[in-house]
Amino acid sequence: MFAIVDYDTGNTRNLKKAFDYLQVSTILTADPQQLAAADAVILPGVGAFAAAMAALKERQLVGVLQALARSGKPVLGICLGMQLLFESSSEYGEHAGLGLLSGRVSALPTDLNVKVPQMGWNQNELRRPDSPFASIDAAYTYFVHSYYAVCPATEIVATVQHGVQVPSIVQQQNVIGMQFHPEKSGRVGLQQLAAFKEMVSANDFSSN
């Protein structure tokens, strides 16, 4: 059972359908006990960083998510959910994140002859050949975002180019993030969710 964090930000219906296709049962919940009992925690999200963090705080989930991740619970952040895993964001001011990954979230540059937000398909380049997410290499996934993670190279699994090098998958042991929407990325997106499923089943996050 995977628990999808319910904090009123993000389209969870398509994400649930993707896991259904992979024969992974899910529950949409903000109950700390259900999150703790799950095999993995999925943190979705669309919208603004500060509002999302406020929603997590309102539900008293910040400390819960931090404790679960630090106990070894697999955590997957998707789109804004990935950004929340980092230490801070400069979106509409300076805001603290969950601090589960090193780095901060910054605005995509608007002066590099690319459209902001990045909205559409982009081609991934694998940065960690031994990763379970190796099928992402040269494949296209679907993005919708105006901010991106600036983080250590040791956390980066894959990137795309959008004026700057944008981390598309990050991982630090059991904490993983995907900047793209796997549930909107067709077969390739399902492959990445399947890879995460296998990592959870094997309890093997040793690639980082």
Swiss-Prot record:
Compartments it resides in: Cytoplasm
Function of the protein: IGPS catalyzes the conversion of PRFAR and glutamine to IGP, AICAR and glutamate. The HisH subunit catalyzes the hydrolysis of glutamine to glutamate and ammonia as part of the synthesis of IGP and AICAR. The resulting ammonia molecule is channeled to the active site of HisF.
Protein keywords: Amino-acid biosynthesis, Cytoplasm, Glutamine amidotransferase, Histidine biosynthesis, Hydrolase, Lyase
HAMAP family tied to this protein: HisH
UniProt source species: Lactiplantibacillus plantarum (strain ATCC BAA-793 / NCIMB 8826 / WCFS1)
An individual GO BP term: L-histidine biosynthetic process
Residues of the active site: 79, 181, 183
Main location: cytoplasm
Origin: domain of life: Bacteria
One Gene Ontology cellular component: cytoplasm
Span of domain Glutamine amidotransferase type-1: 1-206
Catalysis: reaction(s): 5-[(5-phospho-1-deoxy-D-ribulos-1-ylimino)methylamino]-1-(5-phospho-beta-D-ribosyl)imidazole-4-carboxamide + L-glutamine = D-erythro-1-(imidazol-4-yl)glycerol 3-phosphate + 5-amino-1-(5-phospho-beta-D-ribosyl)imidazole-4-carboxamide + L-glutamate + H(+); L-glutamine + H2O = L-glutamate + NH4(+)
Pathway: Amino-acid biosynthesis; L-histidine biosynthesis; L-histidine from 5-phospho-alpha-D-ribose 1-diphosphate: step 5/9
Entry EC number(s): 4.3.2.10, 3.5.1.2
GO MF annotations in UniProt: glutaminase activity; imidazoleglycerol-phosphate synthase activity; lyase activity
SUBUNIT field: Heterodimer of HisH and HisF.
The name this protein goes by in its record: Imidazole glycerol phosphate synthase subunit HisH
Transmembrane segments: none
